[in-house]
Amino acid sequence: LLGESEERIKKARGTRQRHERQQLHDFMIFSVHTGMRVNEVLATKYRDCKIKKNKKEGLLLVIQNVSGKNDIREVIGLVGAVKVYERLKERNIHEPNDLLFPQHHRDQLNTLLKEAGMKTDTLGNIRNARSFRSTYIMFRLRWGTPIKTIATNCGNSSHVIDKYYAKYITPKDLEEQL
């Protein structure tokens, strides 16, 4: 999907279309590297983000004041989110209270998914912006991140992660941890 997105950026007609496609591209990466809900990503402001060094992961993006379903929490984004944040700061004219992603590119994402032949998954489920959160959760499970850690970062319960995601993990996915 990212490869198709990069091609669409190259083929953009005009500065505005290129900017919108870059924003969508970065929205996808940011979402997959934070596990945040779509509405949480769309509500994130520049002032909420701080880059932090971590011995294990390298650079992380700490996102404060994330208002989720049940509470306000802090989210830790992986290095991909750091890179997106740095690109957004460089590319966009912004103030601390401005949103990272001031608009939802729903139609653009649907077009991209269709062009990439990825609008539905192998089970026939429709993909959309919420799918990036699921991708984050599945990647973290496959990398051996404890369910409680994933749940805390995503603003979910361990039960939800176990019930809806962990059931898809196979022994092959866990070879390195076993």
Feature locations, PLM:
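Short basic/aromatic active-site micro-motif
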Residues: 21-25, 102-106, 121-144, 154, ...
